[in-house]
Swiss-Prot record:
UniProt cross-references to PANTHER family, sorted A to Z: ACYL-COA THIOESTERASE, ACYL-COENZYME A THIOESTERASE 8
Name of this chain's protein: Peroxisomal acyl-coenzyme A thioester hydrolase 1
Gene that produces this protein: TES1
EC annotation from Swiss-Prot or TrEMBL: 3.1.2.2
Substrates-to-products reaction catalysed: hexadecanoyl-CoA + H2O = hexadecanoate + CoA + H(+)
Lineage: Eukaryota, Fungi, Dikarya, Ascomycota, Saccharomycotina
Hydrolase keyword on record: yes
Record InterPro entries: Acyl-CoA_hotdog (IPR042171), Acyl_CoA_thio (IPR003703), HotDog_dom_sf (IPR029069), TesB_ACOT8-like_N (IPR049449), TesB_C (IPR025652)
């Protein structure tokens, strides 16, 4: 495997931040655009804003929700600066606001709520949305297929590729197509998609698939050298947060994956082929964290599209832990996505 392909799955390197001050950070590397896009990947902004804020809260505080807005398209040719503002420090909750800048202009903002970790004995009322039979489940090979091979069969097959090429010029570019394959095969996320993922003829209100993160991330709280310090000084601010030393990096990784193949799935609910949009931009992104997301395990995702109107589309996702069957996170995103008429798309495809 080439160095460039290995770098595609190096999440720590992709998201790495350099401190400018205790509350300001700059990206170490340029923020990449996803395949087929000109702007910075939204998941990079969401996850880096969370990572920046984690550098300013004590070890025993965990994120419970994140509300963010994409204000201006990110420039992949310029590093991003993040400023973390402390809104409130309480005994049980901490509120942070993170602002991202390029060229001295605000491009993204997020508000993040952290809650102190409580003892299990404290919990009184409990309820978890659970999917029966999901516990310990692996993707059914009769219904799901690894994304790389599915893309090659359902999109890159010469006969089918010509149909996609009629919708967009990028499908006439062999280099661009190889980038899609590389992203599926070597990228941060590994997917198991339903076999009709790229073009579904059935009418449905729900899309489900499996996803996990390839690079290993610890689930042991404060697994690095700071573990003993955490035991005696839980309110200590960490010196560093990496996939190896802090289980809270799972939240960062989840924030990254939560913006991938979410808004892009809108055509699935309208019996249109994926990638048939002419313009797409995310407007906002909200995450509710219900538990520590173990991102190296398969995560089962159920997506719905409650509303599409006047080029504004709302998608919602429920993410379930396949080890327990319990819901681990809920995500909502609205985007401004422009499509041609359904009749024209179907006629071309």
């Amino acid at each position: 495997m080439s160095a460039s392909k290995m770098a595609m799955s190096n999440l720590e390197k992709i998201l790495e931040l350099v401190p400018l001050s205790p509350t300001s950070f700059v990206t170490k590397y340029l923020p990449a655009a996803p395949v087929g896009s000109k702007g910075t990947f939204g998941g990079t902004l969401v996850s880096q804003s969370l990572l920046a804020s984690l550098h300013t809260v004590p070890l025993n505080f965990f994120p419970t929700s994140l509300h963010s807005y994409f204000i201006k398209g990110g420039d992949p040719r310029t590093k991003i600066t993040y400023h973390v503002q402390n809104l409130r420090n309480g005994r049980n909750f901490i509120h942070k606001q993170v602002s991202a800048y390029q060229h001295d202009k605000l491009i993204f903002t997020s508000m993040i709520l952290f809650a102190v970790q409580r003892s299990k004995e404290h919990d009184s009322l409990q309820h978890w949305e659970t999917i029966p039979g999901l516990q310990g489940k692996q993707p059914d090979p009769h219904r799901y297929e690894e994304a790389t091979s599915l893309f090659q069969k359902e999109v890159l097959d010469p006969q089918k590729l010509s149909r996609y090429a009629s919708l967009s010029d990028r499908f006439q570019d062999a280099t661009s197509m190889s980038k899609y394959v590389d992203a599926f095969q070597y990228g941060v996320m590994e997917y198991q998609f339903p076999k009709d993922m790229f073009y579904s003829a059935r009418h449905t209100d729900e899309l489900d698939y499996f996803v996990k993160v390839r690079p290993p991330i610890t689930t042991v709280e404060h697994a690095g050298d700071e573990s003993s310090l955490h035991k005696h000084h839980p309110y200590r601010i960490p010196k560093s947060i990496t996939p190896e030393n802090d289980a809270r990096y799972n939240y960062v990784a989840f924030a990254y994956l939560s913006d991938s193949y979410l808004l892009l799935t809108i055509p699935y609910f309208h019996n249109l082929p994926l990638y048939c949009h002419s313009f797409s931009v995310s407007l906002d992104h909200t995450i509710y964290f219900h538990q520590l997301p173990h991102v190296n395990n398969w995560i089962y995702l159920k997506i719905s599209n409650p509303r599409s109107h006047w080029d504004k589309h709302l998608v919602q996702g429920k993410y379930f832990d396949t080890q327990s069957g319990r819901i681990m996170a809920s995500v909502s995103q609205e985007g401004y996505v422009v499509y041609g008429s359904e009749r024209d798309i179907r006629a071309k495809f």
